[in-house]
């Protein structure tokens, strides 16, 4: 991370090239890259921009998914949206832009690691989106988002995460609850056991799965619920 100073002309030109937009008001880009720990005056950091950028990103990603997955239901679209606007995805975009070279922070933040540092990188991406939106308008912001998210949206189609993760995100978004898994039965000999597991989400019918391990049975139950609710397409018979 850089020290608390404005971008050099060379760094600004390099970053604007990666963004695909030359800022009319250069101060907006500086503010988008300034963490609260490095601010010198009220309103000079990215916190307000982050608030706006989160909404602009959500709108553009929702529109992208709506147009890309024409047969997907609301549940599936919500899961995809949550994945694409997550801190993990935003931090990955930050890494692609090498934003760690430009973010301005105080000394205490430079010591952060792991998830907390990932959240800082993700926040800066959202503030950057807001700065682009304010400087160039929605179309320019959309162009930037498509540049770095469209490929991720398409790749996500063939690379769904495990069923338990998908079900948890959907149930949080839809009902505000976490799925509950219960082992109903363990049968068979020790060398070849069978586990029957039920998954429950408040407000809808439960589903069960039977497999040779508890985790595998949970995955089967979660998959059946995702398919029944239209979040995932149902697997062909025999698969």
Curated annotation (Swiss-Prot):
Primary location: cytoplasm
EC numbers on record: 3.1.26.3
SMART domains registered for this protein in UniProt: DSRM, RIBOc
Active-site residue numbers: 54, 126
GO cellular component, one term: cytoplasm
Single Gene Ontology MF annotation: metal ion binding
InterPro entries, sorted: dsRBD_dom (IPR014720), RNase_III (IPR011907), RNase_III_dom (IPR000999), RNase_III_sf (IPR036389)
Entry's Gene Ontology BP terms: mRNA processing; regulation of gene expression; rRNA processing; tRNA processing
Domain DRBM: 162-231
Cell location: Cytoplasm
RNase III domain location: 12-137
Lineage: superkingdom: Bacteria
Reaction equation(s) it catalyzes: Endonucleolytic cleavage to 5'-phosphomonoester
Positions contributing to Mg(2+) binding: 50, 123, 126
Required cofactor names: Mg(2+)
Assigned keywords, A-Z: Cytoplasm, Endonuclease, Hydrolase, Magnesium, Metal-binding, mRNA processing, Nuclease, RNA-binding, rRNA processing, rRNA-binding, tRNA processing
Enzyme class, UniProt record, top EC level: hydrolase
Aminoacyl-tRNA synthetase listed as a keyword: no
Function noted in UniProt: Digests double-stranded RNA. Involved in the processing of primary rRNA transcript to yield the immediate precursors to the large and small rRNAs (23S and 16S). Processes some mRNAs, and tRNAs when they are encoded in the rRNA operon. Processes pre-crRNA and tracrRNA of type II CRISPR loci if present in the organism.
Subunit structure: Homodimer.
PANTHER family assigned: RIBONUCLEASE 3, RIBONUCLEASE III
Entry's family note: Belongs to the ribonuclease III family.
Protein name in the entry: Ribonuclease 3
Organism: Rhizobium etli (strain CIAT 652)
């Amino acid at each position: 991370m850089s020290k608390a100073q404005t971008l050099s002309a060379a760094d600004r030109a390099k970053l604007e090239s990666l963004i695909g937009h030359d800022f009319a008001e250069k101060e907006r880009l500086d503010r988008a890259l300034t963490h609260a720990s490095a601010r010198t005056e009220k309103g000079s950091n990215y916190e307000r921009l982050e608030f706006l950028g989160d909404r602009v990103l959500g709108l553009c990603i929702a529109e992208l998914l709506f147009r890309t997955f024409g047969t997907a239901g609301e549940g599936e679209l919500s899961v995809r949206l949550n994945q694409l606007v997550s801190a993990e995805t935003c931090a990955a975009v930050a890494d692609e832009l090498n934003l760690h070279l430009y973010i301005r922070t105080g000394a205490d933040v430079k010591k952060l690691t792991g998830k907390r540092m990932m959240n800082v990188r993700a926040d800066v991406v959202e503030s950057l989106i807001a700065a682009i939106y304010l400087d160039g308008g929605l179309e320019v912001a959309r162009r930037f988002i498509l540049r770095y998210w469209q490929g991720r949206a398409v790749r996500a189609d063939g690379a769904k995460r495990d069923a338990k993760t998908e079900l948890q995100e959907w149930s949080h978004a839809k009902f505000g609850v976490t799925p509950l898994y219960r082992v109903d039965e363990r049968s068979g000999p020790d060398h070849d056991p069978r586990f029957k597991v039920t998954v429950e989400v408040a407000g809808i019918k439960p589903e069960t799965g039977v497999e040779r391990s508890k985790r595998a049975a949970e995955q089967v139950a979660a998959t059946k619920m995702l398919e029944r609710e239209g979040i995932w397409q149902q697997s062909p018979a025999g698969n």
